[in-house]
Amino acid sequence: TALLLGEVALEAGVPPGGLNVLPCENQIAERLVVDPRFKLLSFTGSAAVGWRLKEKCGKKKVVLELGGNAGVIIEPDADLDFAAQRCATGGFGYAGQTCISVQRILVHHSIADLFTTKLLLQVARLKGGDPSDEGTVVGPLIDHKAADRVEQWIAEAVAQGARVLL
């Protein structure tokens, strides 16, 4: 995905060298982190590795996406029907338990109400049940501990002002 982002940046007119995507092994990454020629570090991955890299960055700007909180950004010019369908299946398929499940949706304020309506319609259409049954999209959580964790997240969100919509 990161390599594709680099290709898209070039196609969009970012000059060569303006954005560098450097997938590499740990030893090389750590040398790049301390190299003063690089002004920004962007890292997606585990919290343990991200915080270790941040400690080594010194005064560089750092953007960390840690712990698997896969985010989706919905802009006003997006195909909202397509985005709502993909966010619904991406967030609820396999009960949201894969490392690439949609866990956050960032929506431009000008389309937030419309997108929310479309997303709720898509989520309501998802079939829940036994994962071995054909057509089931939303199966059970893996164990009681996982269910308790989800209930805790919901309670925390509500305590901070969120509303349960479905």
Regions found by a protein language model. Name each.
Residues A12-G13, V33-L40:
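Short, surface-exposed connector motifs at secondary-structure boundaries
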Residues A29-L32, D148:
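Short, solvent-exposed polar/charged micro-motifs at secondary-structure junctions
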Residues L3, E30-R31, W51, A155:
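Alpha-helical segments flanking ligand/cofactor-binding loops in enzyme cores
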Residues G18, L40, S46-L166:
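ALDH superfamily catalytic-core signature
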Residues T1-A29:
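PLP-dependent aminotransferase-like
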Residues A2-L3, D35, E151:
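Conserved strand-to-helix beginnings and helix N-cap segments that scaffold or border functional pockets
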